[in-house]
Design a protein with these regions (language model features):
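P-loop NTP-binding core
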Residues: 1-220
Length: 220
């Protein structure tokens, strides 16, 4: 989860209060080494579980500075869950701080979202350099799962130019699926539900389902 807890808040609605009042979040697992099983929450989707973030995670990087093997804490937390779940998704903030480094160290692969805007391209090289360092120092098995175009509007020339540029550079690593601009994607979090439950027929929901299928097919 991101430090702001946005992913957890949008993926669950029945247990919103539980998340806000939960005594065990990913923060406690990282800082206090709480049992990760105690942090797992059910959702309205039977096969989907979440681990909530906490606002305290914003300052966790400072608390982690004096901890041993601080770059590998999240990996140690999540390793017991690997045999229980087909996929574990770690939602990261855009910043390349210690929490994100922990996520990249724990991950098997990374999905790189690219907003269909010019300035989004500037951050890619920095992220790729970080991934290169992580691979050489902390996680040799880390791979790029793919580049995902988001906030895409095919009517805009710039969006198509960005897509073509990313495709030219990264070729087969670019997902065929794009996440289009869709009002339902911005509405759903305000109701505390994932888009697939808010409006399964919306463009945003269909885009995410297509992405899920593409990821599954890539990993067969």
């Amino acid at each position: 989860s991101t430090p702001s807890n946005s992913s957890a808040a949008s993926d669950v609605y029945k247990r919103q209060v539980d998340i806000k009042q939960s005594e065990c979040t990913i923060y406690e697992c990282i800082i206090d080494r709480a049992n990760v099983q105690d942090a797992i929450l059910d959702t309205e989707i039977d096969s989907l579980k979440v681990i909530s973030s906490h606002i305290n995670l914003v300052g966790a990087e400072i608390e982690m500075l004096n901890l041993p093997n601080r770059e590998k804490i999240l990996k140690e937390v999540l390793t017991p869950l690997k045999k229980e779940y087909d996929y574990i998704l770690i939602d990261c903030s855009p910043s390349l701080g210690l929490i994100t480094i922990n996520a990249l160290t724990a991950a098997d692969s990374v999905i790189i979202p690219v907003q269909a805007e010019y300035f989004a391209l500037e951050g890619i090289s920095k992220l790729l350099n970080t991934i290169k360092i992580i691979k050489s120092k902390l996680n040799p098995a880390l791979e790029i799962e793919g580049f995902l175009l988001t906030m895409y509007d095919s009517r805009l020339r710039q969006a198509n130019q960005i897509y073509d540029e990313v495709k030219r550079h990264f070729q087969e690593l670019v997902f065929n699926t794009v996440i289009q601009r869709n009002v339902k994607l911005s509405e759903a979090p305000s109701y505390g539900v994932p888009t697939i439950l808010y409006d399964a027929e919306s463009t945003g929901a269909k885009n995410h389902l297509a992405l899920a299928k593409e990821i599954i097919n890539r990993n067969k």
